[in-house]
Amino acid sequence: MLKISNLRYEILRDVIISDFSLQLRAGEVKTLFGPSGCGKTSLLRLVCGLEDKKSGQIENGFKKISFLFQENRLLPNLTALKNIEIFSPAGVSEIYALAAKIGLSLSDLNKFPRELSGGMQKRTAFLRTILSGCDLALFDEPFVGLDRDLRGVLIEILVSKIEREGLACLLVTHDRFEAARLSHEIIELEPKGMGLRRVVGLDEPLSARDERYEERVVSEQFGGVSYYE
């Protein structure tokens, strides 16, 4: 379990996160939903140790964390395949099978990041994250720039990992439809300090959700608007 208690984070005395608490268990997905600059990405960086907190506690009982940044952050001197393999206990056959599902050919996997489009790099980074053997995954806007069909395939792969292997996920998104599709709990935040506006709990199993479910939740909870305004 990940347990965050009364967390405070500052940059040059500017309070980014103030008194924030959260618990995340195996197989759960919790989504941080709020405007840009409210501290969502900072929280992910604190969880994985890239930033130092001012006060509070972060207790992580998971064995391995993987972080899918907004930027793809592939190693430039390795092929797409090697970028995945170097962090993954999965066999090459599993990598090939999942890559084919998301439109990456064997030829694509043997290319260096600079030879791939931005979308291909994003898909490679996604595979690297979910095949890393992690039991806690941090996702920062993982589907931005992907078309609707491709987004759906990636979500199906992620949901399978969550439900079959108990992967825990902390997700940052501005997209209400993504939040409705993937979250057990949507944590809606105030514009400053990661203040809690409200929590929306969703009980429907992830694998039972579809676009109609997304639309219903968005309409009921957010008035039908897709992006945080």
Predicted regions and their residues:
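Helix-to-loop junction immediately C-terminal to a conserved catalytic motif
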Residues: C48
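Conserved ABC ATPase "signature" region
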Residues: V92-D108, S160
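Catalytic Walker B motif of ABC-type/P-loop ATPase nucleotide-binding domains
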Residues: A137-E141
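Hydrophobic anchor residue at the start of the ABC signature
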Residues: F126
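Conserved ABC ATPase signature
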Residues: F112-L116, M120
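The feature captures the beta-strand-to-loop junction immediately N-terminal to the Walker
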Residues: F33-P35
